[in-house]
Amino acid sequence: MEVLMAERADLVFHNKVIDGTAMKRLISRLIDHFGMAYTSHILDQVKTLGFQQATATSISLGIDDLLTTPSKRWLVQDAEQQSFILEKHHHYGNVHAVEKLRQSIEIWYATSEYLRQEMNTNFRMTDPSNPVHIMSFSGARGNPSQVHQLVGMRGLMSDPQGQMIDLPIQSNLREGLSLTEYIISCYGARKGVVDTAVRTSDAGYLTRRLVEVVQHIVVRRTDCGTIRGIYVTSRNGMMTERIFIQTLIGRVLADDIYMGPRCIATRNQDVGIELVNRFITFRAQPISIRTPFTCRSTSWICRLCYGRSPTHGDLVELGEAVGIIAGQSIGEPGTQLTLRTFHTGGVFTGGTAEHVRAPFNGKIKFNEDLVHPTRTRHGHPAFLCYIDLYVTIESQDIIHNVNIPQKSFLLVQNNQYVESEQVIAEIRAETSTFNFKERVRKHIYSDSEGEMHWSTDVYHAPEYTYGNVHLLPKTSHLWVLSGGPCRSRIVPFSLHKDQDQMNVHSLSAERRYISNLSATNDQVRHKLFSSDPSGKRGGSILDYSGPNRIICNGHLNFIYPTILHENSDLLAKRRRNRFILPLQSNQEREKELMPCSGISIEIPINGIFRRNSILAYFDDPLYRRKSSGITKYGTIEVHSIVKKEDLIEYRGAKEFRSKYQMKVDRFFFIPEEVHILPGSSYIMVRNNSIIGVDTRITLNIRSRVGGLVRVERKKKNIELKIFSGDIHFPGETDKISRHSGILIPPGTEKKKSKESKKKLKNWIYVQRITPTKKKYFVLVRPVVTYEIADGINLVTLFPQDLLQERDDVQLRVVNYILYENGKPIRGISDTSIQLVRTCLVLNCDQYKNGSSMEEIHASFVEVRTNGLIRYFLRMDLVKSPISYIVKRNDPSSSGLIPDNGSDRNNINPFYSIYYKARIQQSLSQHQGTIRTLLNRNKECQSLIILSSSNCSRMHPFNGLKYHNVTKESSKGDPLIPIKNWLGPLGTVPKIANFYSFYHLITHNQILVNKYLILNNLKQIFQVLKYYLMDENGRIYNPDRCRNIIFNPFNFNWYFLHHDYCEETSTIISPGQFICENVCISKNGPHLKSGQVLIVHIDSLVIRSAKPYLATPGATVHGHYGEILYEGDTLVTFIYEKSRSGDITQGLPKVEQVLEVRSIDSISMNLEKRVEGWNERIPRILGIPWGFLIGAELTIAQSRISLVNKIQKVYRSQGVQIHNRHIEIIVRQITSKVLVSEEGMSNVFSPGELIGLLRAERTGRALEEAICYRAVLLGITRASLNTQSFISEASFQETARVLAKAALRGRIDWLKGLKENVVLGGLIPVGTGFKVLVHRSRQHNNIPLETKKKNIFEGEMRDILFHHRKFKLLNYCIPKNFHDTPEQSFTGFNDS
């Protein structure tokens, strides 16, 4: 102690905070100066001091100490903004799903990391003595990333498969998580629980296998005499300085190291910290060191090849069991690390990139010939540098040069103005050979059904020559042109050939062709052709002879349109399968009649009305109620107006309410208050009790009325009703009490008491209530009475001329009650209930006879007068050749849909099979091109029918005073502007005919507020000129005289009006694809993506389509023009993803490497390097030597690569394992070779595993070439292929190993530790090693005899004894003679 005190006086006094790293350094220097005993004494004092201080400080942790970083809010906002922009780009087709995922993850990872860095500075500035800060940054408990989760943001998490979830947890644990965030973070928590349970056992098993492989490796010699070594250098950037120092310290040099002429270190010198610092200072050449790889032995190792012992810092002692130390050093951290489950966000990054920023504002210049355009990993456009590129940034008085290395991305253009701190280039981080990546497949699925088109050429993948898998050679879009396939089951034989033009009736409300399964083909044919085939019914033939004339079939009916005021617009609400167009009538009348509701016209999607269809309705506000209640019709019966067979269009709609037609002039509404409560609610009132207004029913609900409470418990909830009214306890003489559930009219006497009698003023409802069996009382409830008028006069609603019943179409007004008799009505809070609806019903039941049924087709006509545009609803009466085939109660049948199309010039072969005469029917429904498809299921023929029922159009008309403004609805219903449903191709929900878009030109001057009477018009229709394009790019001019008909598609056209005369900036040709938000006219960006089909002088027709971006190398599934269904796979991207550094994925990876399991994909860069290597080496060294040296170097390189892979996983978790431990393991698993078929069958059998050095030696001794292949044995296989069968049998497969050993007559020489432990012998390590040393010294003196009588004996001696100098890898053959007693050796020598 005196010596220590004396020395202490001379020591330097340091006053600074010591963290964990500084503590490690201090301890190592103390050991160097004072040795182990003194150091432990000093450290005891440090420990005591620490405990004293901690007790005195008494740091506690309160919730207020968790302070969120103030900059978090704007950082998260910024990241969200970036994500939003990214989402937009993905929607427009600028980036594909993989790029979006990558970028999204990097945005959030960067935000999270930045927040973590901010956290430390924030604590340091605001609260340096914060306990959380002190603990986490002292290294005592917790680390910054854990504290970051408490006060920063939790960030990105992995799912159970280890894939990153791209939805980050933005909250921290202090603020609390939302429900979604909680569920995502539960993944991590569950992972942690599973890891501790499962992975701990995995780690233990890993340790056991590792020790099994190397338990016999003991230090038995000082020097094996090898001259080989491994070169280490820190120059090429593959190794950081820290790793370089760790690799060198404790090693032994394999060669002298010179600095110029001067030798600064000699061979076999062990490397300490001073020597390493000298190497770094002098920037010495690559340094050759000895490693276990270069040792000439297999079953032991020499001191110099192992180096310093990690425990006491000197060269390792003889007899040290370094194998077991190595096995435990690798296995043990795994056991510790399973307790950590942290998720690093850099999963998708292939090495982070450095950014070069502009130092000041200025113009950038570079040589454009040295770069070529490309895409970055995030889908941004950039330039890739071929070679190092000099970039000049010029400001007014400064010129700045930047050198950008090759393979970097330049993110700006030549001569572009850049701002200060703008990122101008991204330097790729040098990815090392061993940065193993995996190839991941990402499938992109179609969002909608439609037809697939490519905007570039594609290649067939060679393995799928006859399949439908294609490879993309360059970046391009895949377009899914929207539309739906239709299948016909009734006509399984195909009458239409591919590319035939035909007329097809529109789809049903469901947009599916599902026919009645019960109808056979014969029935269909009979139905189709039993009606008059010549089609000569009165006025129903369309004449197409005139070039510019359409003669209509006489049945024209108009409904009064809206007057479009300035800034007003027609609005359509999409409801189920119909369109509702609210119609405004004259404003003065509107105020009188309908204070707050308008008339709505309801048109089916296919535009066809049947008999008794409702054309328009309006909801009278007089018949609205806010409260719940019961409707009663009194005693008069009613009948439902909507019969079962008329419900086809409503089938499948849950919200359908049948309407009841009234024959009565009044009905009654009995109000009641209803609350539907969850089953677990605590109800604060009793059943049958009487409460007042505003009584508390549950904790947060109060009653709105007073009265009797009835509670009814259902399966899942509780229904609580409150009946208002008087309670009446009946006397014996009371008449009312005998009745229950009846309405009593006013005027009836009500006996209140014996004395007075009173007459009722209003209707009342009497309800008898029996709380117990004997008692009962009567509740008298008030009733609201509604009178219904006989029908509103149509004149008040519509102008006079509508009411003239023209041409078979009649309109009548009907009032419907929307609720049936006695049905309780439940009012949802704040919405009113409409009790009565007034409807306008179409009547057309003149023709009762059989096969033909009347239909009314609705279409819109646009009329322009004096610059004002009006839309008229036009009704056409059409006779349908087929009535609906409907089987009652058959849910699958939605009826056969007739084709009432005119067969122009025999376009439709369906008719021509049966009749040579051409059938010309009125008003064809949907024209389309038919394309036969690859059938998905062979039983039904698939047809694709393009129909233009989804037309929309933009109207930039010049000189008009109306604007396309969508009014907001008060309830916020989604409103569809009706403009978008009108267009050159058709009518609102369907095409009545290809030319049903008319400009009605009139020669009479018409005033705005007057209605256009049809008789004033001369029926001259201007037909627009179009260009049509089919899939093959042929362009047609659809004259009436020719057969070409447009192929429209379901729901997917819209129209864009554009004045080409004024602005010819963009030339648009048919077939061109247009992305969303691209400006094609000066009126602003175009709002939908699609393909241009028709170019007109002032408009375009665009078929809507969705683009999907695909980059080169992506695989496209499906054929050009194939019909895709929603959810089909469109593209498969293959991208590289760095393996996760998470230990829970890390441990299996370590195990995967050590067990040498085949990984799904070899690292791309390693594959390329091996190919290049095989080409170059033989070229340099000539054929035989090149291949031999190449094979040797490949084995060496693969060993180093394995070591680096294992180190990488541990280093990512901050665990330091010395390379030499891993090298000992790797040496064992790479030291075997497999004898090939052509091998020496007289010595080794083919397929036998032998040691590499032993194979080489045997070949030299017998002067014959042995063919063998280097193999990597997994640690389990290596454990079962050792020299000792006892060791193998005690590991696994005991019976098999022992049986095999017995059959082969194997001898176990008990060299390892395990065999001796099993049999209770002395372990040949440590003190038990001295016997071995003594023996080996004697054997070293045996002379080598070359010439002997028996040559074979000499050769065998070569094989078996030369291993003293060149130790062979001799596992499988029992060649362990050097452990036998000495007499046997003498005998062998004398023979």
Curated annotation (Swiss-Prot):
The places in or outside the cell where this protein is found are: Plastid, Chloroplast
Which molecular function GO terms apply here? Answer: DNA binding; DNA-directed RNA polymerase activity; zinc ion binding
Q: Which HAMAP family does the record cross-reference, listed alphabetically?
A: RNApol_bact_RpoC2
Q: Which GO terms describe its cellular component?
A: chloroplast; DNA-directed RNA polymerase complex; mitochondrion
- Stated role: DNA-dependent RNA polymerase catalyzes the transcription of DNA into RNA using the four ribonucleoside triphosphates as substrates.
Q: Where does Zn(2+) bind?
A: C224, C295, C302, C305
Main localization category: plastid
* Protein name per UniProt: DNA-directed RNA polymerase subunit beta''
Source organism's superkingdom?
Answer: Eukaryota
| Gene this chain is encoded by | rpoC2
Which cofactor does the UniProt annotation name? Zn(2+)
